[in-house]
């Protein structure tokens, strides 16, 4: 085995053993070596003599050290270090030896006479514990023995048989001889007569096995033990275990894997081996619990003294760290693992956990005299002194005593009924920790044998034992067990069916397969990564693997040194409990991609640290990594340079069936039913591109709308009843306002929740949700994927476009049909068309057609102009194209429209700067014909298709080229009818004759013709209105009472004069005053008539003369020469080209531009 360098740290081990760093222990655990077989060689250079190296040998204690710096750490006892002259913080080279020579005889001599006196005094203890403290010896070694916790003795190794030059291993039959060393040489007779000073002492102990340990009883008996990995029930690994038989204290394991001494045992002593990540509530095996008890006792004693009461010290009530359990054979138990029943796991403090190492020891004999009285101590989180001050302040002592006795009798009766099945069938260990029992023991408790200090007993029987309530024990809330003994209160781990469906069953199954190499799950925010990860963690846990979940968002603000400490603890824990799955959620927040103009030193350091640590962990131990991020590009690229991340899975937006499934699940949790069978199908179609989070918010909004409408309906019905009994005279505004206030207060006072336990129950059998509720929820809601995406919205309707019948038909076939008839197209074996080129004469409706088709087909629309993506520098233009397609992919289904496409993607080789060449190359990459665009349709419009790079016009990119030709007579008539649809055209106007006179006009020319005619009519209307206003001013027959004199006050205060209004302004004011002059009785009717009269008076009517005048002023925008030129270009484009494409060679002609490429 390769050697490593480590730093020495002192630790109170009280033996000649050491604790090794995880870099070595991971390999030892995986190799399944016997702990007693492992010998550790230490070599170092002392400070005094730097030229000479020293070598020492010791055994391994089975522990793992925590790395506090960049170097591994090895821990040894201070007394051992002093004996071999090894200073703290010295760098040592560590080598591990497995097979060693076994010593037959070892002769030892005390270093001093005081050492001999200690050995002589504690001879029996040394004979019992020597093999527990020492694993090997070597010539001239100063061996330190620890007979008591306070004393040590030093022995010098004088001789080893067989003779060795390095070291020899002690085993059960090794004969250890200790020569006496006294101040005065005693006589031979005195030596022989001293029963405690035998020269020859033999050390024996039972054999232990792989990852085994040794336990010593009070009478010196050494018991065999083994280490095994634990899986607490319930777990799918032990699903074959009958639940009815899994009660009590039981251990399920394959007896064939145990040593013979344990195979024949019916009961074993189970304890938890403390390691990284061991829960703090794990009995006395954790030193933290002892420190916690001391601090609690000190605090309680202080409060007791202050209150003047006397309670017994609670340190006398201490949970046992070793629980006796029944050993049950299970041939299906995974190798190296054992299953722990729920009650046993609770007593050990490791309920609902996987991967803790436990020690199985042969149980001692049970108590001969069974206890007849059991004392139950309840756990409490409030000190007794505080309880005395709170409860029954004004009651007398007699009242207190009577009430306490009554409560105790009731509690004893109920507890005895619940514990009776356990007393009849289970073994019990003294001072065992009990689980919760409903409200009787809300925090658990401790069961103690009365007047018996230790031991265990076989089933007592409910008729042979009585129960007493002892003093309450103060414990923190974190110490309370999570397991409840009552069946209806047991908190099992939620199964996969209890979770919300993600419609990603195949993905979850792939991620749940524990294989070599890490996996990356990436997707946008709200795509359901956390939900998928939680289900994967649940499935992996049920397979018996330990799962460690870390949310990197919560520690992203920590410093680099703190992060290293956090991950050192995590790596140690997953290595200790292997096989493990380490989940790093939102890893990109901790090690983001390096940015060009920002400090990315910490990201690089953490990435390198991850690679170095995790690579070694995953190779040496069965550890798998699962990370999540928003995208692959958001992570530091160093992560992908090694085999740390080998698989990546993208979490895409759910399809229609998945959306329907998710919607149904959320509605079920709300106890809501659909009014129509096809309602969810329709909603699933309308929510294209919605993420699971958006669907949840949508269901919540629809549910709240449903509840709000029911509340308003109930309030309106109550209001109608009150109105019928007490009518509101004249529609009193105050009464109506009061009623409205009551309704609003009623709504605001209700608590609306999004779960099945909502405080508002519309119906015990569930509410019925309507299409209107979903329409209200969809109104104004922007999905998360579209937030921040610039989408263009056009007011142009499909009917507003005249002509272009062939182009409109092709666009609908390409864009609308795949969405409208998705089931038919989903089974199509061919790749669907995703790109269309619109070309034609200027002003023939290419841009108008593209903007209208998005609204017609219900697709999002993104319009791009050339200058938005062109940049003279290398890189930004390509980045703009990539971001553009990413925006479209996020907003899918989406139409990506490029106007004047010839200016963005001309033929390559003719750009002096090379900008458009790079843009074309990037667009070719994005519009790859082999992969296709999922949900993104590309529309390009140009009047010069011959200038576009030919590679973009090949199948798979811009598949179809559609011409927008000059309109013929029918098209011109259709265009004029569409343009004048919202205009008031006189019946005398013949649009057919107008269309006949517009030969050669484009669609834009016809629109300009209609708009010019409308402006002519507007001018005529304004002139007519002004003449009528002036005529009305000179009319003297008007009623003087209704005569209105209009003046305008000047802002100049010094000049007291009035300025008369102009006739046109006077007419406007008079019309406004006429509405105010009308009476209140017929106000509504008069207002309606006035509006109709005003609309009729102000309507603009276009006459034939207006069209004739407009026709005389409007000219064709395309000349005949330009039309013939474009016609030739289009004809050549349709019929085919000669294939003489530019080869990229720069032109040698005078004045020609040369490219930089």
Curated annotation (Swiss-Prot):
GO biological process: protein import into peroxisome matrix
InterPro entries xref list: AAA+_ATPase, AAA_ATPase_domain, AAA_lid_3, Asp_de-COase-like_dom_sf, ATPase_AAA_core, ATPase_AAA_CS, CDC48_domain_2-like_sf, P-loop_NTPase
Composition-biased stretches (Low complexity): 205-217
Catalytic activities: ATP + H2O = ADP + phosphate + H(+)
Topological relation to the membrane, as annotated: Peripheral membrane protein
Domain of life: Eukaryota
Region (Disordered): 187-221, 1135-1157
Main location: membrane
PROSITE patterns: AAA
Keyword RNA-binding applies: no
Record localization: Membrane
Keyword entries, A-Z: ATP-binding, Hydrolase, Membrane, Nucleotide-binding, Peroxisome biogenesis, Protein transport, Transport
Name the record gives this protein: Peroxisomal ATPase PEX1
Lineage: Eukaryota, Fungi, Dikarya, Ascomycota, Saccharomycotina
Encoding gene, per UniProt annotation: PEX1
């Amino acid at each position: 085995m390769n050697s490593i360098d480590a730093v020495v740290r002192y630790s109170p081990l009280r033996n000649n053993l050491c604790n090794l760093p995880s870099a070595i222990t991971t390999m030892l655990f995986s190799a399944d070596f016997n702990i007693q077989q492992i010998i550790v060689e230490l070599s170092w250079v002392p400070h005094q003599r730097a030229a000479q190296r020293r070598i020492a040998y010791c055994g391994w204690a089975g522990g793992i050290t925590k790395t506090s710096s960049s170097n591994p750490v090895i821990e040894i006892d201070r007394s051992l270090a002093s004996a071999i002259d090894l200073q703290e913080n010295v760098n040592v080279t560590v080598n591990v030896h497995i097979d060693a020579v076994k010593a037959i005889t070892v002769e030892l001599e005390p270093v001093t006479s005081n050492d001999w006196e200690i050995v002589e005094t504690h001879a029996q203890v040394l004979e019992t514990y020597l093999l527990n403290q020492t694993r090997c010896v070597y010539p001239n070694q100063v061996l330190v023995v620890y007979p008591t916790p306070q004393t040590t003795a030093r022995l010098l190794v004088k001789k080893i048989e067989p003779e060795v030059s390095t070291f020899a291993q002690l085993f059960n039959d090794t004969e250890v001889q200790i020569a006496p060393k006294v101040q005065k040489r005693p006589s031979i007779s005195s030596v022989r007569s001293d029963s405690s000073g035998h020269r020859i002492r033999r050390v024996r102990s039972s054999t232990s096995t792989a990852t085994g340990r040794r336990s010593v009883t009070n009478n010196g008996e050494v018991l065999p033990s083994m280490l095994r990995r634990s899986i607490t029930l319930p777990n799918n690994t032990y699903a074959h275990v009958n639940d009815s038989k899994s009660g009590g204290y039981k251990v399920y394991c394959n007896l064939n894997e145990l040593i013979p001494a344990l195979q024949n045992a019916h009961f074993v002593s189970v304890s938890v081996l403390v390691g990284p990540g061991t829960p703090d509530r794990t009995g006395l095996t954790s030193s933290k619990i002892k420190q916690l008890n001391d601090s609690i006792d000190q605090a309680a004693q202080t409060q007791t003294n202050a209150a003047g009461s006397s309670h017994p010290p609670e340190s006398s009530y201490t949970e046992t760290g070793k629980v006796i359990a029944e050993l049950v054979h299970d041939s299906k138990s995974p190798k190296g693992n054992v299953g722990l029943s729920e009650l046993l796991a609770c007593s050990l403090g490791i309920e609902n956990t996987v991967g803790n190492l436990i020690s199985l020891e042969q149980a001692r004999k049970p108590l001969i005299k069974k206890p007849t009285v059991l004392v139950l101590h309840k756990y409490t989180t409030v000190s007794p002194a505080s309880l005395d001050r709170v409860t029954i302040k004004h009651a007398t002592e007699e009242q207190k005593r009577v009430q306490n006795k009554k409560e105790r009798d009731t509690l004893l009766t109920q507890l005895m009924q619940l514990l009776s099945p356990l007393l009849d069938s289970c073994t019990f260990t003294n001072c065992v920790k009990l689980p919760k029992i409903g409200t009787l023991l809300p925090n658990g408790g401790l069961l103690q044998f009365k007047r018996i200090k230790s031991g265990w007993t076989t089933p007592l029987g409910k008729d042979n034992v009585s129960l007493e309530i002892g003093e309450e024990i103060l414990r923190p809330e974190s110490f309370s067990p999570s397991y409840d003994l009552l069946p209806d209160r047991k908190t099992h781990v939620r199964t996969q069916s209890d979770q919300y469906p993600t419609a990603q069953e195949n993905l979850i199954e792939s991620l749940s397969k524990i294989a070599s190499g890490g996996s990356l799950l990436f997707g946008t925010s709200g795509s359901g990564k956390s939900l998928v990860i939680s289900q994967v963690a649940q499935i992996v846990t049920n397979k018996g693997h330990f799962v460690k979940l870390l949310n990197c968002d919560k520690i992203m603000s920590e410093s680099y040194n703190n992060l290293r400490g956090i991950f050192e603890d995590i790596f140690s824990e997953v290595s200790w409990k292997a096989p493990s799955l380490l989940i790093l959620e939102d890893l990109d927040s901790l090690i983001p991609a390096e940015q060009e103009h920002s400090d990315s030193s910490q990201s690089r350091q953490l990435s390198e640290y991850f690679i170095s640590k995790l690579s070694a962990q995953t190779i040496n131990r069965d550890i798998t990594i699962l990370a999540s991020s928003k995208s692959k590009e958001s992570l530091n690229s160093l992560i992908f340079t090694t085999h740390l991340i080998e698989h990546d899975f993208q979490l895409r937006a759910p399809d229609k069936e998945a959306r329907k499934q998710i919607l149904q699940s959320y509605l079920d949790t709300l106890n809501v039913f659909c009014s129509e069978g096809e309602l969810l199908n329709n909603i699933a179609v309308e929510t294209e591109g919605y993420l699971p989070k958006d669907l949840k918010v949508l269901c919540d909004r629809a549910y709240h709308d449903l509840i709000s409408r029911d509340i308003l309906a109930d309030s309106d019905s109550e209001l109608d009843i009150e109105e019928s009994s007490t009518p509101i005279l004249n529609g009193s505004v105050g009464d109506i306002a009061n009623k409205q206030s009551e309704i609003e207060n009623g709504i605001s006072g209700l608590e609306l929740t999004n779960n099945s336990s909502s405080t508002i129950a519309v119906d015990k059998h569930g509410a019925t949700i309507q299409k209107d509720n979903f329409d209200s929820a969809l109104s104004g809601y922007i999905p998360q994927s579209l937030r921040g995406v610039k989408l263009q919205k056009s007011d142009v309707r499909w009917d507003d476009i005249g002509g272009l019948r062939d182009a409109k038909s092709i666009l609908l076939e390409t864009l609308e049909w795949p969405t409208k008839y998705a089931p038919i197209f989903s089974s199509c074996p061919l790749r669907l068309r995703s790109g269309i080129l619109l070309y034609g004469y200027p002003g023939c409706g290419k841009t108008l057609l593209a903007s209208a088709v998005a609204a017609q087909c219900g697709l999002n629309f993104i319009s791009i102009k050339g200058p938005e993506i062109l940049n003279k520098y290398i890189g930004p233009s390509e980045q703009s194209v990539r971001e553009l397609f990413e925006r479209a992919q996020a907003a899918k289904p989406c139409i990506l429209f490029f106007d004047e496409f010839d200016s963005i993607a001309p033929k390559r080789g003719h750009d002096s700067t090379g900008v458009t060449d790079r843009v074309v190359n990037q667009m070719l990459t994005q519009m790859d014909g082999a992969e296709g665009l999922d949900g993104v349709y590309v529309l390009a419009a140009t009047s010069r298709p011959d200038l576009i790079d030919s590679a973009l016009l090949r199948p798979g990119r811009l598949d179809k080229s559609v011409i927008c030709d000059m309109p013929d007579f029918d098209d011109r008539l259709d265009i004029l009818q569409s343009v004048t649809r919202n205009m008031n055209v006189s019946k005398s106007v013949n649009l057919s004759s107008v269309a006949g006179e517009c030969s050669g006009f484009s669609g834009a020319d016809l629109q300009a013709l209609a708009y010019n005619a409308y402006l002519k009519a507007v001018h005529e209307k304004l002139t007519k209105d002004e003449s009528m206003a002036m005529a009305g001013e000179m009319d003297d027959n008007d009623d003087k009472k209704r005569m209105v004199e209009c003046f305008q006050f000047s802002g100049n205060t010094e000049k007291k004069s009035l300025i008369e209004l102009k006739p046109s302004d006077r007419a406007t004011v008079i019309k406004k005053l006429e509405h105010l002059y009308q009476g209140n009785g017929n106000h509504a009717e008069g207002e309606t008539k006035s509006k109709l009269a005003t609309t009729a008076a102000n309507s603009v009517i276009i006459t034939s003369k207006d069209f004739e005048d407009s026709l005389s002023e409007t000219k064709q925008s395309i000349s005949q020469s330009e039309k013939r030129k474009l016609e030739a270009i289009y004809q050549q484009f349709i019929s085919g080209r000669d294939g003489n494409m530019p080869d990229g060679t720069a032109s040698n002609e005078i004045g020609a531009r040369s490219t930089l490429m």
